[in-house]
Each structure stands twice: as structure tokens, then as C-alpha cells.
Amino acid sequence: MAKLDKNQLIESLKEMTIMEIDEIIKAVEEAFGVSATPVVAAGAVGGTQEAASEVTVKVTGYTDNAKLAVLKLYREIAGVGLMEAKTAVEKLPCVVKQDIKPEEAEELKKRFVEVGATVEIK
């Protein structure tokens, strides 16, 4: 197997999606028995906020011609039937997924924005 240098590895990572990079991180953690979770220094109280570990993705709007595409994508991601998806998309804002990782939320937001939706992550 050809050995990659640091720059080649970084260039390869630039071409990947967040989800692919997350899978690589998990594989490295497992292979080497380490964790990529940052260590919080003892005594560091207040002053800084921790990044949200779980977030909620909401569709807050969509362009005039994007309703059908948003409905189809909502249905696919939320795993609901046509009528439930139609009701949710017509009564905005609607929660797509909740208690998910920020990386997954960004990926979902990207997919919805591509079809013409406005998305909020909280």
C-alpha cells in the first residue's frame, strides 16, 4: 500500500463529506483505542459554553416552487407517510429530526437548502 504524506491526507479529507470524515474518525478511534473527545480542564468553570452535543433541525420555510421537493425530502428523512409529511410541511416550522449530532444536522440542512428550504438548527 502506498504511503500517504500529511498533505495528501489533508487533500483527500477536503474532498469528503462530513459524514465520511466522521466514519474515519470512528474507525481511527476504534483501531487505536483512543477518543477524539476533547478533555475538559479541571477548574474551568463558567465563562465558556460547551458546544451543543445534540441539536434539532427545523424547516422554517421554502421557496414557492420547492414545496414538493421539501415534502419528498422531509418524508424520506423523517420516515413518515405522505399525509403526515404534507401536514408538517404546510404547518411550518416543522421539526425534521431532534437530538442529533451537529455534524448530521449540518448535512441535513445542506440537503434541505439544496431543494429550496430555509432551515434552522437549535
UniProtKB/Swiss-Prot annotation:
GO cellular component: cytosolic large ribosomal subunit
Subunit structure: Homodimer. Part of the ribosomal stalk of the 50S ribosomal subunit. Forms a multimeric L10(L12)X complex, where L10 forms an elongated spine to which 2 to 4 L12 dimers bind in a sequential fashion. Binds GTP-bound translation factors.
Pfam family, one: Ribosomal_L12_N
Keyword terms, alphabetized: Ribonucleoprotein, Ribosomal protein
Gene3D superfamilies reported in the protein's UniProt record: 3.30.1390.10, Single helix bin
Organism taxonomic ancestry: Bacteria, Bacillati, Mycoplasmatota, Mycoplasmoidales, Mycoplasmoidaceae
Gene Ontology biological process: translation
GO MF entries: mRNA binding; structural constituent of ribosome
CDD domains: Ribosomal_L7_L12
Keyword Chloroplast annotated: no
The protein's name: Large ribosomal subunit protein bL12
Function text: Forms part of the ribosomal stalk which helps the ribosome interact with GTP-bound translation factors. Is thus essential for accurate translation.
Family: Belongs to the bacterial ribosomal protein bL12 family.
